[in-house]
């Protein structure tokens, strides 16, 4: 299992948008994205710090992705 890198919220937003997630609304400092066909939601905090690993894994789980899918996206594969 490959190690999950530290990433910023902007990178996870780009990953979600690449996979057809659409910005639904913002609540405070969080962006709420949804997928039109799977109806899955992902809540992304908006700040300029790296996302904690637990938050990142929770976000991937609620959006229906695996750690390896994100790592492949970040490495450009």
Predicted regions and their residues:
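Aromatic side chains
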Residues: 15, 21, 33-34, 65, ...
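C-terminal structural segments of small proteins and small subunits
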Residues: 49-77
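Flexible, active-site-adjacent loop/turn segments at secondary-structure boundaries
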Residues: 2-5, 42, 49, 58
């Amino acid at each position: 299992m490959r190690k999950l890198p530290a990433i910023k919220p902007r990178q996870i937003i780009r990953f979600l948008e690449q996979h057809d997630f659409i910005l639904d609304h913002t609540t405070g400092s969080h962006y709420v994205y949804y997928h039109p066909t799977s109806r899955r939601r992902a809540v992304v905090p908006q700040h300029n710090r790296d996302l904690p690993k637990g938050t990142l894994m929770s976000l991937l789980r609620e959006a229906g992705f695996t750690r390896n899918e994100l790592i492949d996206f970040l490495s450009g594969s």
